[in-house]
């Protein structure tokens, strides 16, 4: 069987999304580990897990596992179901071979320019997680807080003046490049308390690589066509 090494999903896609696993083909020898818990996801069940925690898969069987996975942000109805899951009875849903005609998929997954409020939320969550780690250097922690809040403030200034205007993209790039140049060489100069991930890779994936997506501009015009 194949193994999935321990890792954390920390790129931008996972800031607001979770993944539902529906095992189609599996074996009792397949175990999924998340944090300090482990479980066998049986065929036909539906599972949700916290991808911010360290997780891995161990397949000691000769069976290749096949899962249907669905990534979504989720409506209030979805999250209400998640909250109440332990109190609800399991429902067996019979297979229906009829074509699905009303399957809804995301059409606007990423904005051309990250909204300042979203950037601030990501920054504050990451800083709080690192500040909760007593092993981090307080002076470096202070420097990173100033660096990331400077990024947010300058980003908000350009956003307030120009929004999605392509004429402002050079200014946005300059802000991102300046921030990237001031990151410490050590990717683990600060480490999160919750899952022991270095701060730099998270900054790179959740902010610097995600904050400016010029090719998405057309999608936000009245005649826009979503990109693949």
PLM regions and their residue ranges:
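Charged, amphipathic alpha-helical linkers/stalks
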Residues: 69-138
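C-terminal non-catalytic accessory extensions
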Residues: 156-228
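Extended amphipathic alpha-helical scaffold segments
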Residues: 121-170, 174-177
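Conserved double-stranded beta-helix
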Residues: 1-24
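Short beta-strand His + acidic residue motifs that chelate non-heme Fe in jelly-roll/DSBH
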Residues: 4-7, 30-32, 49-50, 54-61
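Short, structured patches in soluble enzyme cores that scaffold and shape functional sites
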Residues: 24-26, 34-36, 51, 59, ...
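A short hydrophobic beta-strand segment most commonly corresponding to one strand
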Residues: 17-23, 46-48, 62-80
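A short beta-strand-loop-beta hairpin characteristic of the jelly-roll/cupin
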Residues: 5, 23-43
């Amino acid at each position: 069987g194949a193994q999935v090494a321990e890792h954390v999903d920390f790129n931008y896609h996972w800031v607001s999304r979770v993944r539902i696993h529906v095992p189609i083909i599996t074996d009792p020898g397949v175990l999924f580990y998340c944090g300090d818990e482990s479980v066998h996801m049986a065929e036909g069940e539906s599972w949700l897990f916290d991808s911010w925690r360290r997780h891995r898969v161990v397949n000691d069987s000769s069976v290749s596992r096949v899962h249907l996975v669905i990534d979504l942000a989720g409506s209030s109805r979805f999250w209400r179901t998640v909250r109440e899951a332990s109190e609800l009875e399991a429902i067996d849903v019979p297979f229906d071979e009829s074509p699905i005609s009303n399957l809804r998929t995301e059409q606007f997954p990423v904005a051309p320019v990250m909204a300042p409020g979203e950037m601030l939320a990501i920054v504050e969550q990451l800083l709080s997680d690192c500040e909760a780690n007593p092993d981090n250097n307080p002076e470096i922690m202070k420097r990173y807080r100033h660096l990331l809040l400077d990024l947010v403030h300058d980003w908000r200034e350009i956003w307030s003046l120009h929004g999605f205007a392509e004429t402002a993209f050079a200014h946005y790039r300059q802000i991102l490049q300046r921030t990237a140049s001031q990151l410490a060489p050590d990717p683990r100069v600060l480490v999160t308390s919750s899952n022991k991930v270095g701060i730099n890779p998270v900054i790179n994936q959740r902010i610097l690589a995600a904050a400016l997506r010029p090719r998405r501009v057309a999608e936000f015009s009245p005649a826009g066509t979503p990109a693949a």
